[in-house]
């Protein structure tokens, strides 16, 4: 996010194929501008109902589904000509009302509902814990997500993706079973602050 299409183009030239975006308009613009490069676009930011069509038409993955209404809109708006939209349910690991995501104890029921929707393929869970510089604290924050993921798989839910870990906590996330990490700062550098 906030990096120009030229930065994405340079990373693609170095072999990177998957790119994540937090902001719908910015992501759609980059995906359109770089459409000839065969890149896979992942939407990882909060998603509002009025933005679902643009996401359904542009992105290959959505990591931040936390309400059935959003999943239903994505399913309705995913073009038939495109492969099913790959979806992760975002869980709120900090139990803070200000954070996005469904509570851990409600994720399983939501996932069962999403798994039945057409044009979507439920892939797993996504989490963004509160930043913490301590490795063991990072692992403790992510462990309940891994445990939920394992329980859901044991219960027969066909999921394979645990999307957690960013530049500051990817080692802890991998140790806790992450199958997909979202690394931006370590590749592109610190984002410039608005107005700076």
Specify the residue positions occupied by each region the protein language model found.
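Gly/Pro- and small hydrophobic-enriched strand-loop and loop-to-helix capping segments
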Residues: 178-196
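Conserved alpha/beta-domain cores
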Residues: 2-168, 174-176, 188-190
């Amino acid at each position: 996010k906030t990096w120009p299409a030229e930065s994405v183009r340079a990373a693609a030239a170095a072999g990177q194929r998957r790119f994540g975006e937090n902001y719908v308009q910015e992501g759609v613009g980059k995906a359109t501008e770089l459409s000839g490069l065969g890149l896979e676009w992942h939407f990882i930011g909060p998603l509002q109902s009025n933005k679902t069509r643009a996401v359904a038409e542009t992105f290959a993955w959505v990591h931040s589904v936390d309400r059935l209404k959003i999943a239903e809109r994505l399913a309705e708006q995913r073009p038939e000509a495109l492969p099913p939209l790959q979806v992760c349910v975002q869980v709120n690991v900090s139990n803070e009302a200000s954070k996005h995501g469904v509570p851990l104890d409600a994720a399983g029921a939501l996932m069962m509902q999403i798994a039945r929707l057409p044009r979507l393929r439920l892939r797993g869970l996504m989490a963004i814990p509160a930043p913490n510089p301590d490795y063991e604290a990072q692992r403790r924050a992510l462990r309940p997500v891994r445990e939920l993921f394992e329980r859901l798989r044991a219960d027969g839910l066909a999921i394979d993706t645990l999307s957690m870990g960013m530049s500051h906590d990817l080692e802890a996330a991998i140790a806790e079973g992450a199958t997909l990490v979202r690394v931006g700062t370590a590749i592109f550098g610190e984002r410039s602050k608005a107005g700076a």
